[in-house]
A protein has these predicted regions:
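Catalytic core of pol beta-like nucleotidyltransferases
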Residues: 1-16, 20, 31-37, 52-245
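Hydrophobic/anchoring residues in structured secondary elements
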Residues: 23-26
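Short hydrophobic/aromatic beta-strand micro-patches
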Residues: 44-48
Length: 245
């Protein structure tokens, strides 16, 4: 999927989407022009406030695009986006930083992005990730049948922590690998894992989202225990960064 293809085929979107959407953006790897075989196409659809029934109808109307083109649609009402904007939402910074506008009936969302304040919840996010790590640790001790899923969650945490660190360092990056690379470059030998180790871990996330085959030999209590320690160490670095920035 490419931006060019999306723009050329935009009118093939369901009529209800084109009628109700305030704006449609592509973001993520397609917008960055660094997609690969493991990438999907992320699309944001901003709509006016509507009933829950109408909102569900909008979401269900794109099922063929999701199935046939590996598209993932994020639908948001403007009232929700306005509340997110007040807090300087990471997601909205993601759109502002790299989103590409495909379709627009009103400039309301662009104006909202123009006034987007700085995000101040990074430390709170890191503390929440610490709680998730504790939950995973308890889960593994109680039931080792969820290791593959737990590893996929750890992959998301690894990525999100690195995204948060890049934000704190004033170098926003929402990619799959690039935030990790930047953190490795920043901390050097202090950083708990290598890019290749992270890529193997992230395969567990792709196994859930894209059906990618994984190395079953890695599905062990020892492997996840090792990653729990690595993510804890990464969080310690991230929290120390919060204290100096």
């Amino acid at each position: 999927m490419t931006i060019k293809y999306l723009k050329e085929h935009l009118l093939e979107f369901p009529e209800i989407i084109l009628k109700k959407a305030i704006a449609i953006y592509v973001y993520g790897s397609v917008a960055r022009n660094d997609s690969d075989n493991d990438s999907d196409c992320d699309l944001l659809v901003c709509v006016d406030d509507c009933s829950e029934a109408e909102f569900l109808l909008l979401k269900s109307s794109v099922s063929s695009w999701e199935k046939n083109f590996n598209c993932e649609f994020a639908f948001y009402r403007m009232s929700t986006l306005k509340e997110m904007q007040k807090k300087g939402s990471y997601f909205l910074w993601h759109i502002k930083q790299e989103g590409v506008l495909l379709y627009e009936q009103s400039s309301a969302f662009q104006e909202l992005l123009f006034q987007l304040p700085s995000y101040t919840g990074t430390k709170s996010d890191f503390l929440e990730y610490s709680e998730i790590l504790d939950d995973i640790n308890k889960s593994v001790l109680q039931d080792n049948t969820t290791i593959e899923y737990d590893l996929s969650v750890l992959a998301v945490l690894a990525r999100n922590i690195c995204i948060g660190c890049c934000y704190l360092l004033g170098n926003m990056d929402f990619g799959r690998k690039s935030p990790v690379i930047k953190c490795i470059n920043f901390w050097g030998a202090k950083f708990p894992f290598s890019l290749s180790e992270y890529e193997k871990l992230y395969d567990f996330r792709l196994a859930i989202t894209r059906g990618k085959e994984i190395n079953k030999d890695l599905v062990t209590e020892e492997y996840i225990a090792c990653w729990l320690k690595k993510i804890h160490s990464t969080l310690s670095l991230a929290l120390s960064l919060c204290e100096v920035i």
